[in-house]
Every structure is written in C-alpha cells, then in structure tokens.
Amino acid sequence: RSLKTKRKKIMILDEISELNKYVVVHPRFAAAFDYILNTNFDGMPVGKKEIEGKNIIAIIADEDGVPMMESCANFECHNTYIDIQVCFNGVETVGWKSRTTCVEPRGTYDKEKDVLFFEDAPDHFFKLHPGQFGIYFPNDVHAPMIGEGRIRKLIMKVKVY
C-alpha cells in the first residue's frame, strides 16, 4: 500500500534567469512566465492589467519602501491567487512565515480582496534585488515592501484553480 500525503507548496525565491525551471509547479505558470520574460516593463505605468482574464493579472507597483513595523502590520496571505513578485528597481525586504504556524488572524478572510491578515510576526526576512523574484503560495504569509527608497516591481496574480 502507498501512503498518500498532500504537500503544501512553499515560497520560492530565485533569479529571473531561472524562472522557467518552475513552469511545472502550476498549470498557469507557463503563461505568467511568458508574460514576465517577453514584456518590456520599462516605462510601463503603475496599474493593473488582465493577462488571461481573472486567471492571470499583472500589477505594476512603484512606491517608497516602508519601515518593517508598517509592513508587518499588514502581514498577509491569499486564498485565491498565488503572487509572483519580480523586483525591477530598489531593494525590497520581505517578511515571511508559514500560514500553518500563524495563530493570530486579524479579522476574517476578505474574499473580495483575497486577503487575510495576521497579527503574528514573520519568522524570516529576505531581500529581493533587481532581477530576482519571489513566488508566494496561499500558505505563505508575507510582509512586502520593506525598505528605503523607491521600489518598482511586478506582482503577477495567478489564480490557484
């Protein structure tokens, strides 16, 4: 007899040059990665654009980084979408913790905005430099945009299923 277990996917961090090795992780990643690798983002205005209807959405963000405490006050995760975040300019620090170890939800899940906040503190912090990306699955509670100076990035929202 075989024992079947359901493994949760966890955050991925890597260089853009390595993006395609993750295409097998999710059926919609091929289309999302194609958009990331074949689009000129220089000068693209801030805002949201549907790539494959509501299944894949691209958001350009260009904002000042925020202090750690401010970002951690919005420690978030999503149920409907996987985030693929690509850093273009600046250095972004991101806080992270597994959702399975979070114990203090703040409010309830907002289905309209696809967000659930936690009062918990991140277990780990890491930096994204230009040319690097992070993939955050529903199990990844994250606090983005920590840093000084301007941070320009792409956030791809990929519908889980």
Enumerate the language-model features and the residues they cover.
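Short, Lys/Arg-enriched N-terminal segments with co-localized hydrophobic residues
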Residues: 1-10
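Long, hydrophobic N-terminal alpha-helical segment
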Residues: 11-52
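A short glycine-rich, His/Asp/Glu-containing loop-to-beta-strand
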Residues: 48-68, 76, 80-88, 96
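A short beta-loop-beta micro-motif enriched in histidine and acidic residues
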Residues: 71-82, 101-105, 121-122
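Short, conserved beta-strand element in jelly-roll/cupin
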Residues: 80-92, 98, 108-114, 157-158
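Short beta-strand His + acidic residue motifs that chelate non-heme Fe in jelly-roll/DSBH
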Residues: 94-95, 124-126, 141-148
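Conserved metal-binding segment of the jelly-roll/cupin
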Residues: 127-141
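A short hydrophobic beta-strand segment most commonly corresponding to one strand
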Residues: 135, 150-161
